[in-house]
């Protein structure tokens, strides 16, 4: 993810050796992940990633971060593993003062201590926090939810509904610079594993229309974590484990062709009937 409008610093999750945690993840068998960042130099080359030099990273697993539009507030996921307790995910927030990120605070989103909340992202207007949860009341599996942000903290929680959520898993919500919602799903028809979709509001019905991003964005592997370069609705990065026999995730770049003109009309056959 990018912080604010700076296109030359990219934040991402990694289990590389510099990550703090020493325990192995019970699902992946790899060490716990931390949040890293990489800077792009004047030659547009990405430099060696470094872990955040702050209290954001811990012995537990951190990842799936996102930022406010001014780049001064970061939301992220922390997965804690404690003795004699199930592993679960929580959302934390950290404020930046100068170049340093402050001590993170847990977001009081749910009173339910048995449900996980993860993958936070702010709406373009900053008035809602979108996230993923397995809390009761959804469509099944992991669903996309949102909670409104008020002056006093968090307000009510909404499920995004059956047009977006399925009985399988939906996760990794994000927004493009033009406000389009993107997410990954194993429930909508796709190419295999997690596929990336975008949700467009139908101007006539007000309902969501879900579109699969197709190849080459999606593959038979897991494709997720779409992020857009600030001010560029047609390029950015996403993650995928395609082509890796070990199932490890890698970061890929993308760039969509720019649409300069849209031509609409009707096509008739030789009898004058609309095709």
Cite the ranges covered by each PLM segment.
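Short, conserved micro-motifs composed of acidic
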Residues: 1-266, 270-273
């Amino acid at each position: 993810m990018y912080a604010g409008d700076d296109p030359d610093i990219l934040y991402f999750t990694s289990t590389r050796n510099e990550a703090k945690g020493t325990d192995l993840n019970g699902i992946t068998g790899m060490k716990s992940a931390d949040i890293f960042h990489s800077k792009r130099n004047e030659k547009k080359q990405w430099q060696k990633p470094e872990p955040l030099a702050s209290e954001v990273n811990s012995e537990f697993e951190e990842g799936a971060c996102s930022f406010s539009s001014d780049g001064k507030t970061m939301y992220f996921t922390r997965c804690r593993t404690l003795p004699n307790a199930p592993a679960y995910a929580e959302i934390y927030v950290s404020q930046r003062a100068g170049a340093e990120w402050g001590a993170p605070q847990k977001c009081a989103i749910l009173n339910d201590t048995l449900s996980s909340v993860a993958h936070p992202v702010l709406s373009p207007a900053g008035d809602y926090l979108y996230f993923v949860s397995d809390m009761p009341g959804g469509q099944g599996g992991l669903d996309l939810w949102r909670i409104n942000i008020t002056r006093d903290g968090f307000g009510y929680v909404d499920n995004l509904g059956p047009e977006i959520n399925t009985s399988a898993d939906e996760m990794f919500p994000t927004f493009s610079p033009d406000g389009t919602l993107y997410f990954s799903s194993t429930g909508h028809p796709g190419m295999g594993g997690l596929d990336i979709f975008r949700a467009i509001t139908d101007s006539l019905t007000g309902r969501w229309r879900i579109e699969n991003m197709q190849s080459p964005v999606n593959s038979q592997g897991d494709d997720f974590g779409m992020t857009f370069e600030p001010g560029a609705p047609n390029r950015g990065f996403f993650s995928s484990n395609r082509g890796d026999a070990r199932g490890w995730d890698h970061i890929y770049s993308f760039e969509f062709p720019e649409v300069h003109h849209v031509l609409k009309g009707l096509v008739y056959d030789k009898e004058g009937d609309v095709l």
